[in-house]
Amino acid sequence: MRNKVSEMSGRDAEVVRVVVSPYRICPLGAHIDHQGGTVSAMTINKGILLGFVPSGDTEVVLRSGQFDGEVRFSSGLSSSAAVGIAYLLALESANGMNVSPLDNIEYDRLIENGYLGLRNGILDQSAILLSRYGCLMRMDCKSKEYEIIQPREPQNSDKTKIQKSYKVLLAFSGLRCALTNNPGYNCRVAECQEAAKFLLCASGKAEMDPRLCNGEYFHLILFSSFVILQLIMILIFFQTVEEEVYEAHKNELEPTLAKRAEHYFTENRRVAKGIAFLTWSFEIILEIHVYLVLCFINLWIYFIGSGLEAWKSGNSQDFGKLISASGLSSIYNYECGSEPLIQLNEILQRAPGVFGARFSGAGFRGCCLALVDADRAEEAASYVRSEYFELQPELASQLNADSAVLICKPGDCARVI
């Protein structure tokens, strides 16, 4: 990259800077970022490379190095956010500006919402800017609070099959259509807002911004004092008012709006189950046998997610099941997808070694993603190529055989190197 930019610009390779802006996947939390929901995401080792040389003046000269990358345009991996962030980081670096990731998330949201006209949330930008290698990023899109969560390392005594190393499989459909040209995406966002407006009116909060996250939070603070240990637990029961209101009034909602709200609330619960980001406090309480607290823990588990702390415990199988459940909700409640994408998703579900699969991105075109046993990734990729060609020969023939299904590893955050 440095040599190519050096040739184009006539400058020494030593002064060339390179932005690495990775693509992202969203295992859980699809289509709820624009409603202020809680999302999860990680980056992969594929993305945008942007080489540049600071010019010292106000002129910007752009040239294309190549368009022969492995990942096709409109693939459902957030390429628009990756490009926007690459430009932001390059321009900031060239001008000696130090901009925080949270500010850049907002700047790129303005690019997507204002310039491109796409009514999406902040999931894509947050994943690209905040992710860390091998970790899952969790973000509350209402408060913008986030956490980087690392799965538990298998212990020597772990003999279970659930703690397997994984890779990410990306299977491309061959469908290409810009989201700004497809009314389906923005229409779904509007329907979510209509559902939120109805539910807020039903709960006497009509003045609030019509997003499904809006309502009240209930904070419960428990304090236990011991000779050595002082334990402060803060349990936040998520969106209790909204879900109670939804359950009470969902039969009054127009059926389409009820489906959108159902996807939002169930997807929030799947994120919580998949991540279980307060597992540590539960383990401490078990050890000290605070039985009164355990009564409240039962309520906490109801909202945060029960038993199998999938991601944090390294349970790829249960985490994969949640991914697949999220995909089904995207099809039946959010009603995105198309026949080729749904077929591709079903093929991935049957593929050897796959823990779970779903659409990637908006789910109107592009690709499907799967979490797959690292030892069976090649076998799964071969199976998907063959099966998809049988069902969709015309679309499959448009794909490069070598990149129709990609085997990816986790990536890192966007950065200048």
Where are the regions that the model predicts?
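Alpha/beta catalytic cores of group-transfer enzymes, especially the acyltransferase/condensing modules
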Residues: 96-146, 357-360, 407, 411
